[in-house]
């Protein structure tokens, strides 16, 4: 049976985003800032916010509170973040890669498990984002998102592993495609379909 556009969106658009984010530390910083700007914001608003950030940097009206803390962290650490993530791609595979990328992106100030998972998804097509929409529609316990960054390394590793397991049960591509379909249905005046929602992940980022 021929697959619909929305069912192949991940395989068409995600590699474009991966290539962009992996190309340089500066591109990775843009990617992470897109993720951070999406926190408690409708996806349709993120593109304008990212453009504003690119124009005004730390002075952007959308970069405030914890989001400004994330930007400050990135300015100091994005080189090592990019190097570590690229090394993980070259040395790890499968679940080991998922866990390693989560450990890397969870270091970013302001990111919890869901947004770190979103970073993994955008950077490498791995893990995925279990946000509030996915919690509700998939009946996943909110405890899967709980992580205390001040907890012991062992405790944090267990929480990361539990999150990765929750994502792997659904597959990264499935989480992406069905989330895009859901957003398109929730905001039919903003989106043509799920494929459109998927496409703008790349369009927001591309120069």
Where are these regions (language model features)?
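Structure-specific DNA junction-binding interface
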Residues: 1-69
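Alpha-helical ds-nucleic-acid-binding substructure associated with the helix-hairpin-helix region
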Residues: 41-109
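Short alpha-helix boundary/capping elements
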Residues: 37-45, 79, 127, 142, ...
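C-terminal accessory module of base-excision DNA glycosylases/AP lyases that mediates lesion recognition
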Residues: 1-20, 26, 68, 83-86, ...
């Amino acid at each position: 049976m021929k697959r619909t556009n929305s069912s192949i969106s991940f395989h068409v658009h995600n590699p474009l985003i991966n290539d962009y984010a992996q190309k340089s530390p500066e591109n990775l910083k843009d990617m992470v800032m897109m993720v951070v700007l999406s926190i408690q914001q409708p996806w349709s608003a993120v593109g304008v916010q990212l453009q504003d950030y690119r124009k005004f940097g730390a002075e952007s009206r959308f970069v405030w509170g914890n989001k400004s803390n994330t930007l400050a962290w990135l300015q100091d650490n994005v080189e090592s973040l990019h190097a570590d993530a690229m090394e993980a791609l070259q040395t790890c595979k499968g679940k080991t890669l998922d866990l390693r990328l989560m450990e890397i992106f969870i270091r970013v100030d302001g990111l919890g498990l869901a947004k770190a998972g979103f970073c993994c998804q955008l950077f490498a097509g791995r893990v995925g984002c279990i946000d509030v929409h996915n919690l509700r529609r998939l009946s996943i316990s909110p405890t899967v998102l709980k992580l205390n960054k001040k907890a012991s390394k062992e405790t944090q590793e267990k929480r990361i592993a539990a999150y990765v397991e929750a994502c792997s049960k659904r597959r990264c591509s499935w989480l992406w495609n069905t989330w895009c379909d859901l957003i398109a249905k929730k905001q039919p005046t903003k989106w043509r379909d799920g494929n459109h929602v998927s496409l703008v992940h790349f369009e927001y980022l591309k120069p």
